[in-house]
C-alpha cells in the first residue's frame, strides 16, 4: 500500500503549474486532495480533470491573503475528511523589477502573498498536522537562498520563507511535525500565471533587460519539469527530509556565498 493511501493533503496555488503537478502526484499515490486557488474557474477545471478514475480532488476557491478564506479552506477540509496529513504552501508569485524601482508598497504586496499568506495557512494547519505527525511543505526558491538581479521584492520574500521554515523545523520538529523547505530553480510551464503574466512580460519592468524576463530571471539552467519536482517532493516527505534543492548543484553556490560572497556575486552576475 502507498504511504499516501487515504491521507489528506491541501495544496495552495493548486490550480496550475507546480501546484497542479503536486496535487496530481498526491492523487496518483492514493491521497485525498484539496486544491486551493483564487482563480476559481481554472480551479474547477483542474479538479474535474484530476478527479478521474475514482480519485478525489476537492476544489476550494480561496485567497491566502484573506484570513476568512483561509479559515473557510481548513474548516471545509476538516469537516469533509476529519483530518489533515499534509499542507503544501505553493501559492505565490514572482516579479520583474529593478531593486531601486521596487517601492515599499511593492514589497508589502508581495510579502503579503508569498510570506504572510503562508504564515496564515501554516498556523491553521499546525494543530491538525501535529496530531498526525504530518508534513508541512513550503515552496521557496533558489532565490530564497541566493538573491538574483531584476526580480524586485521576490528574493526578500523567499528568504523570509526559508527562515520561517527553519524556525518551524527547529520548534515543531521535536513534536513530530515534518517540515520540508523546497528551493527549486525555474519551473517549466506552458503559460505564466494570470496574475503574474504582465509582470513577467516586462510591461511593468522598466529598465529590466530582456534576458531577465525569461523563467528564473534568465538564470542559465535547464527548466525543471513540474511533474518530476512533484514526485521528488513526495519522496522527500516520505523520507522526512529537511530540504530539497533542485538542481542539487546549487548547493555549491550557497556554500560559496558563506565563504566568499564577492566571488559568489560574480558567479551570479555571469550566470544570469
Spans of features found by a protein language model:
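Substrate-binding pocket helix/loop in short-chain dehydrogenase/reductase
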Residues: 70, 98-99, 103-108
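Residue(s) in the substrate-gating loop at a strand-loop-helix junction
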Residues: 141
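Active-site helix of classical SDR
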Residues: 122, 157
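Active-site loop immediately N-terminal to the catalytic Tyr-X3-Lys motif
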Residues: 100, 146-152
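Conserved glycine-rich Rossmann-like NAD(P)H-binding loop of the short-chain dehydrogenase/reductase
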Residues: 31-45
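SDR active-site lid
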Residues: 170, 174-248, 266
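Conserved glycine-rich cofactor-binding loop
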Residues: 8, 13-16
Amino acid at each position: 500500500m502507498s504511504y499516501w493511501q487515504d491521507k489528506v493533503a491541501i495544496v495552495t496555488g493548486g490550480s496550475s503549474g507546480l501546484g497542479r503537478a503536486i496535487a496530481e502526484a498526491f492523487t496518483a499515490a492514493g491521497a485525498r486532495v484539496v486544491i486551493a486557488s483564487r482563480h476559481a474557474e481554472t480551479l474547477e477545471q483542474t479538479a474535474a480533470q484530476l478527479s478521474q478514475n475514482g480519485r478525489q480532488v476537492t476544489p476550494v476557491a480561496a485567497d491566502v491573503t484573506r484570513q476568512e478564506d483561509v479559515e473557510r479552506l481548513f474548516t471545509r477540509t476538516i469537516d469533509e475528511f476529519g483530518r489533515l496529513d499534509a499542507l503544501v504552501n505553493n501559492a505565490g508569485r514572482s516579479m520583474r523589477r529593478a531593486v531601486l524601482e521596487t517601492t515599499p508598497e511593492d514589497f508589502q504586496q508581495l510579502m503579503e502573498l508569498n510570506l504572510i499568506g503562508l504564515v496564515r495557512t501554516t498556523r491553521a494547519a499546525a494543530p491538525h498536522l501535529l496530531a498526525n505527525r504530518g508534513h508541512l511543505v513550503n515552496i521557496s526558491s533558489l532565490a530564497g537562498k541566493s538573491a538574483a538581479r531584476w526580480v524586485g521584492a521576490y528574493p526578500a520574500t523567499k528568504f523570509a520563507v526559508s527562515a520561517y521554515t527553519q524556525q518551524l523545523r527547529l520548534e515543531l520538529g521535536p513534536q513530530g511535525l515534518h517540515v520540508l523547505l523546497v528551493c527549486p530553480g525555474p519551473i517549466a510551464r506552458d503559460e505564466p500565471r494570470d496574475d503574474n503574466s504582465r509582470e513577467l512580460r516586462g510591461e511593468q519592468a522598466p529598465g529590466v533587460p530582456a534576458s531577465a524576463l525569461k523563467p528564473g530571471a534568465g538564470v542559465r539552467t535547464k527548466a525543471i519539469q513540474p511533474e518530476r519536482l512533484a514526485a521528488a517532493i513526495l519522496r522527500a516527505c516520505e523520507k522526512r527530509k529537511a530540504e530539497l534543492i533542485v538542481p542539487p548543484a546549487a548547493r555549491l553556490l550557497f556554500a560559496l556565498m558563506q565563504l566568499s560572497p564577492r566571488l559568489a556575486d560574480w558567479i551570479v552576475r555571469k550566470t544570469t
